[in-house]
């Protein structure tokens, strides 16, 4: 990758990362046999398939807390119902009203929270949380070199006035709430 991140690291390195910093990346085809069998087909189709929905539900880490983005609002309730049956401790299923499969800064985001086998639906309004309204054009990446530079600016704290910064902060805040390290988006954003 342009950042030098090994996204296909061997199991021992992934486990070490998870133990050391509570974070790791699991390339689905390497860790889940069902995903391994369909990876090539998915790559050739170049359209969204049921595997875009199944992936988070088949999480090999068996995470108790999950922030799951979906590309279509119609999938939110079915996923939430599955998570209830899987006895997930806490999850947010999110869909930006602009079509993004994450919490967006261009519009409101629909959220279904699953917590203790109960569901509730609410909206996140980025403007009410103090973010500037963005546009999909401003959030689009470009080539891998440009994208890597923008990510490095974020890591170095040099992008505080960028739409990338806002969307990363908003989604990170949501992850902190879902992981129960913060109890509100407003507190997590600060």
Which residue ranges define each predicted feature?
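Glycine-rich anion-binding loops and their surrounding alpha/beta cores
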Residues: 2-8, 13, 19-190
């Amino acid at each position: 990758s342009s950042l030098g991140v090994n996204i296909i690291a061997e199991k021992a390195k992934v486990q070490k990362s998870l133990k050391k910093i509570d974070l790791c990346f699991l390339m689905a085809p390497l860790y889940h046999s069902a995903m391994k069998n369909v990876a090539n087909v998915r790559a050739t189709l170049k359209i969204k398939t049921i595997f875009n929905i199944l992936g988070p539900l088949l999480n090999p880490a068996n995470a108790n807390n999950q922030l799951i983005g979906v590309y279509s609002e119609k999938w939110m309730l079915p996923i939430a119902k599955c998570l209830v049956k899987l006895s997930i401790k806490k999850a947010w299923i999110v869909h930006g009203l602009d079509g993004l499969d994450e919490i967006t800064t261009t519009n409101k985001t629909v959220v279904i929270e699953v917590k203790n086998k109960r569901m509730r639906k609410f909206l996140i309004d980025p403007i009410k949380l103090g973010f500037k309204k963005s546009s999909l054009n401003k959030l689009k990446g470009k080539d891998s070199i440009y994208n890597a530079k923008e990510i490095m600016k974020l890591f170095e704290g040099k992008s505080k006035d960028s739409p990338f910064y806002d969307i990363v902060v908003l989604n990170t805040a949501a992850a902190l709430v879902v992981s129960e390290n913060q109890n509100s988006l407003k507190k997590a954003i600060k």
